[in-house]
């Protein structure tokens, strides 16, 4: 069932002029709405879309810049770690070298002291031997002079040697 036959059948007349006027009015109204309402609304929506696109693009650029900065910071941090590790290694090597030098110097000093002590011992031993030789020589001369002074028999000579040895033992 169609609406048009019912309206016509109800005694309402169909007027083509009115319908044409309403159609033209409707088209004018649509044109005005498009120009003054829909056009600015679409322009606002387009501007909003452009603004959002720009903001997204700006955010992506900032995100990329942040990533680059993070990568740069990580590279700098890695470089700093490598440099500090290198400094630590150099300090360890220097410490080892200094330790070796100190040990070497201490060994050389100990060897020098041992040599000095050895030469001192040899010197004192030589002095003691020289002094002992001098004493033996003087004792020999003294014994010989006493023997020569007295022509003694064997018993008297033995007694003289024993007395002399006692005398030497007491003088020490």
Swiss-Prot record:
Gene Ontology terms: cellular component: plasma membrane; proton-transporting ATP synthase complex
SS bond partners: none
Membrane topology classification: Single-pass membrane protein
Gene Ontology MF annotations: proton-transporting ATP synthase activity, rotational mechanism; proton-transporting ATPase activity, rotational mechanism
Major site of localization recorded for this protein: membrane
Keywords: ATP synthesis, Cell membrane, CF(0), Hydrogen ion transport, Ion transport, Membrane, Transmembrane, Transmembrane helix, Transport
InterPro entries: ATP_synth_B-like_membr_sf, ATP_synth_b/b'su_bac/chlpt, ATP_synth_F0_bsu_bac, ATP_synthase_B_chain
Signal peptide stretch: none
Database matches in Pfam families: ATP-synt_B
Keyword Transport: yes
Transmembrane parts of this sequence: 12-32
Subcellular location per the Swiss-Prot or TrEMBL entry: Cell membrane
Family to which the UniProt record says this protein belongs: Belongs to the ATPase B chain family.
Described purpose of this protein according to its UniProt entry: F(1)F(0) ATP synthase produces ATP from ADP in the presence of a proton or sodium gradient. F-type ATPases consist of two structural domains, F(1) containing the extramembraneous catalytic core and F(0) containing the membrane proton channel, linked together by a central stalk and a peripheral stalk. During catalysis, ATP synthesis in the catalytic domain of F(1) is coupled via a rotary mechanism of the central stalk subunits to proton translocation.
Subunit structure: F-type ATPases have 2 components, F(1) - the catalytic core - and F(0) - the membrane proton channel. F(1) has five subunits: alpha(3), beta(3), gamma(1), delta(1), epsilon(1). F(0) has three main subunits: a(1), b(2) and c(10-14). The alpha and beta chains form an alternating ring which encloses part of the gamma chain. F(1) is attached to F(0) by a central stalk formed by the gamma and epsilon chains, while a peripheral stalk is formed by the delta and b chains.
Name by which UniProt lists this protein: ATP synthase subunit b
Species, as recorded: Bacillus licheniformis (strain ATCC 14580 / DSM 13 / JCM 2505 / CCUG 7422 / NBRC 12200 / NCIMB 9375 / NCTC 10341 / NRRL NRS-1264 / Gibson 46)
């Amino acid at each position: 069932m169609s609406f048009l036959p019912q309206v016509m059948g109800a005694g309402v007349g169909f007027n083509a002029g009115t319908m044409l006027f309403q159609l033209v009015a409707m088209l004018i109204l649509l044109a005005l709405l498009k120009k003054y309402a829909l056009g600015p609304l679409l322009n606002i929506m387009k501007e909003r879309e452009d603004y959002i696109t720009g903001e997204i693009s700006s955010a992506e650029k900032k995100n990329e810049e942040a990533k680059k900065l993070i990568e740069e910071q990580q590279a700098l941090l890695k470089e700093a770690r490598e440099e500090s590790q290198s400094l630590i290694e150099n300090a360890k090597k220097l410490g080892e070298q200094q330790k070796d030098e100190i040990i070497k110097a201490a060994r050389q000093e100990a060897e020098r002291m041992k040599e000095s002590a050895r030469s001192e011992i040899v010197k004192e031993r030589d002095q003691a031997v020289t002094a002992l030789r001098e004493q033996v020589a003087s004792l020999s001369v003294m014994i010989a002079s006493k023997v020569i002074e007295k022509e003694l028999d064997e018993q008297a000579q033995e007694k003289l040697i024993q007395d002399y040895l006692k005398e030497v033992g007491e003088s020490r």
